[in-house]
């Protein structure tokens, strides 16, 4: 017989940004409605200032509980975006694979409370395009931590990300000062939004 605990099912919402009125920005903002937030994890390939501006109020309120894993050495993540996260008080970890041909690319946003958690996972980076303008797909999932399977899922996510710094100390870089970001920009691992044009997708008309 299945217990009442096990009958509870996670609520899932599909987000098809660009073709519907739903956006990842709105879905991620709702993560912060979880009662009694204890922890927030953000993991993305790319971040820029226009992206962080969209969620700055939520991030500032829960900065002390937020850990952000951000990919670098990808010609998109900017010094300005990373500095904004640092200024907001977020615990910032930059992930450098050491190669431009192998990117840190997971896109995941998690807020965990005492009894509930919310998760957004899909294709959306922490940029204006990823959160609002691009055609993106993802799932927003509400999880009940009284359900053993859903609790295990959330704890598994936490465990995997918590292990990154210990398991890959040469590639996961904790940032505590703006000067560290300036040094990464100087070596080409972060871009300067003031001097770098946004990437343009190749097309039949523009490709050599």
What are these regions, as identified by a protein language model?
Residues 1-208:
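PLD/PLD-like phosphodiesterase catalytic module centered on the HKD motif
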